[in-house]
Amino acid sequence: PADQNWPWWPLLPLYPYGRRRTVFSELIPGQLWSLEQLQGVYYVAVPVRLTIAKVPGGLMLVNPLPPTGEVRQAIASLEQQHGSVLSIVLPTASGLEHKLPLGPLARAFPQAQIWVSPGQWSFPISLPSSWLGIPSDRTKVLLDDGVPHPDVCEWISLGPLDLGVGRFQEVSCLHRPSGALLVTDALVGISADPPALFDLDPTPLLFHARERGDEPLVDTAEARRRGWARLVLFASYLRPEPLEVPSLPELLRHAFRPGLRSIRAHFGLYPFRWKPGWQSAADGLMGNDAPRLQVA
């Protein structure tokens, strides 16, 4: 659908590429909302969130996402009730998943004030923010130039920490009217149940729920939970300890089987082998009754 189209995906060619489905949720009635999209590599996809907070006179957007038609429509519905978008905040120094959409999102809301974290950088090439389409004439640096909406928001810097190629720094926000702490990368909460966003496209879950590439993608509740648990391990560790990479002959032996010769199934190529104990490792990261908080 046209309202899910993201034409700038080649700048950061991550799944699901040019089609970005969005889930809109109200987190705290009348105060806080979220927009979530999937993003990942080789079906290692996790939700990425834009948070919308009510501030005096309008709205504040925190952590930009690609402004697809769905995103703009959801924000427009909130603007009708709560006022226009007054500010857009990029609270982290790195992280292209939020930095690249900032320029297009800023153009979608030309009256909004832009705020970015100090020490902006990117890897492998650190480009000036203006090269990424971020309008310099209405962009301010958090803390250096003040903070947005100080009457209702308290801002605190986590870092900076020197990473060698750049630095980690995140400016987090306590939104007093809702009592919510807005944190991007420093803190995550993970549930054993897959996020609702996967209901729109469970392919990443089903792909990683398998043991070998010649197994079909079968959609069951058990397969979804198993696939999500493995995605949690990938997202937390990149190379989880209970994971092996099969040899090339073994990989090819299970590939290109009938029923799997499609892009969706990656033609049966599944370069992972999970060792015993992987489920216990995943269980230690997830909560059953409520999301388990993890410090990143």
Placement of each model-derived feature along the sequence:
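Catalytic core of the metallo-beta-lactamase
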Residues: 1-73, 127-217, 233-243, 247-248
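Acidic, low-complexity intrinsically disordered regions
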Residues: 2-5, 29, 111, 151, ...
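Residue-identity detector for glutamine
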Residues: 4, 31, 37-39, 73, ...
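A residue-identity detector for tryptophan
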Residues: 6-9, 33, 115, 121, ...
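Cap/insert and terminal regions of metallo-dependent hydrolase folds
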Residues: 57, 65-66, 76-87, 93-108, ...
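Active-site HxH/HxHxD metal-binding segment of metal-dependent hydrolases
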Residues: 77-148
